[in-house]
C-alpha cells in the first residue's frame, strides 16, 4: 500500500485515468485477498493443535476446576484441541453458504467439529447444521456467542427455497436445521422452519432432517407445526441442570418448559425421534446431571448428547470445570443404562454432532426398511 502511494506521488503529472486504474487494480487485488481469507480457515482454526494421543491426555497435570471466587481462566486441556478443518467438501459448503447468504450454527457457535461434519469424517456421513431466520437472536443466553437484539431483521422469504436448493446440491445424508429464537414473531418462526423442511423433502425425500428448535415460549401450536412438518428428529436442548438454568439460560427459558416441549412433540407425532443436549463444566454436580438425564427419559427423549461447555468470549460465562474423557465415558454408560436409544458423551460432542447423526441415520434407515417390508407384506 505504501509503495502504491509513493508511485502516485512520483507520477503526479500523469493523467488522472492512470491513477484511477492503478487504484482500481489494487482494490481488486485487495478484494481478492479478502475473499480468499473469508473462504479459508480463521485465526481460531490455526491456534487449535492436532489431536493429542490418549497417553498425553493421561499425563496432563493442569488444573481442571476453578474454585469459587477465582477469576483466572482455566487452561485448555489437550483433549479439547482439534485439527484445522480442511477438505474439498468443507470448502465447497463454506463457499456456497456465503453465496446464498445462509448461516450455520457450526460457524456462528464456533463448533470445534466443523471439519469432521462438513468433510464426512471417519463415518462417511456428511452433515451440516443450517441456522435459519438470520444470525441474530432475541434471547441472550450467557453461554452462547450468537448475536442478540430485541427486534432482528425481518425473515428472508427466500430462505426455505435457498436452503433446500443448497442442501440438494451438497449430497448430504443428514441435515440439521437449527434457528435463533424469534420472540418478536407471533409464531416464533415455526411456520418458516416447517416450510423449509417441506422444501428439503420435496427435493430429496431420502435425506434425514433434524430440527433443533426453540421452546416457542411454550406455545404448543408452534411445537405441533414443527412436529408434523415431515422432519425425522425433533431436538430441543435442555442445556444445563435445573438449578443452573436461570443463571445460564435466558430468563424466558425454563427447565420444565423444555421438558414439556419435548413431551408434547412426541405426543403430536409418536414416530419422531426426540433429542436433547446437556453442557457440562458449568458447576453442576453429578447428582444434578443424573436427575436431568432421568427427567429427559421421563419426557420420552430418545437420544441425548453431553459435551464440554467452552467459553466463546471473555463476555460469556467462565468454565468452572474441564470434565475428563473418563467422566464423559461414565455419563455415556449411565445414559445407555437409563434406556436412551443413543447417548453421545464426550468433551467435543455437541447437540448437532456427526457421530450421533451417523447412529441416528442407522436407526431411521432400519425403521424405513421395516416399514417398507410391512407394506410389501400387506400387498
From Swiss-Prot:
Keywords associated with the record: 4Fe-4S, Iron, Iron-sulfur, Metal-binding, Mitochondrion, S-adenosyl-L-methionine, Transferase
Protein name: Lipoyl synthase, mitochondrial
Reactions this protein catalyses: [[Fe-S] cluster scaffold protein carrying a second [4Fe-4S](2+) cluster] + N(6)-octanoyl-L-lysyl-[protein] + 2 oxidized [2Fe-2S]-[ferredoxin] + 2 S-adenosyl-L-methionine + 4 H(+) = [[Fe-S] cluster scaffold protein] + N(6)-[(R)-dihydrolipoyl]-L-lysyl-[protein] + 4 Fe(3+) + 2 hydrogen sulfide + 2 5'-deoxyadenosine + 2 L-methionine + 2 reduced [2Fe-2S]-[ferredoxin]
GO terms for MF: 4 iron, 4 sulfur cluster binding; lipoate synthase activity; metal ion binding
EC number: 2.8.1.8
Cofactors: [4Fe-4S] cluster
Chief site of localization: mitochondrion
Record family assignment: Belongs to the radical SAM superfamily. Lipoyl synthase family.
Cofactor note: Binds 2 [4Fe-4S] clusters per subunit. One cluster is coordinated with 3 cysteines and an exchangeable S-adenosyl-L-methionine.
Domain Radical SAM core per the UniProt entry, residue ranges: 122-341
HAMAP family: Lipoyl_synth
Organism, scientific name: Drosophila erecta
InterPro entries assigned: Aldolase_TIM (IPR013785), Elp3/MiaA/NifB-like_rSAM (IPR006638), LIAS_N (IPR031691), Lipoyl_synth (IPR003698), rSAM (IPR007197)
Pathway recorded for this protein: Protein modification; protein lipoylation via endogenous pathway; protein N(6)-(lipoyl)lysine from octanoyl-[acyl-carrier-protein]: step 2/2
Residue positions binding [4Fe-4S] cluster 1: 106, 111, 117, 352
Matches recorded under Pfam families: LIAS_N, Radical_SAM
More details: This protein may be expected to contain an N-terminal transit peptide but none has been predicted.
Chain positions recorded as [4Fe-4S] cluster 2 binding sites: 137, 141, 144
Any one of the GO CC terms: mitochondrion
PANTHER family (alphabetical): LIPOYL SYNTHASE, LIPOYL SYNTHASE, MITOCHONDRIAL
Subcellular location: Mitochondrion
Residues forming coiled coils: none
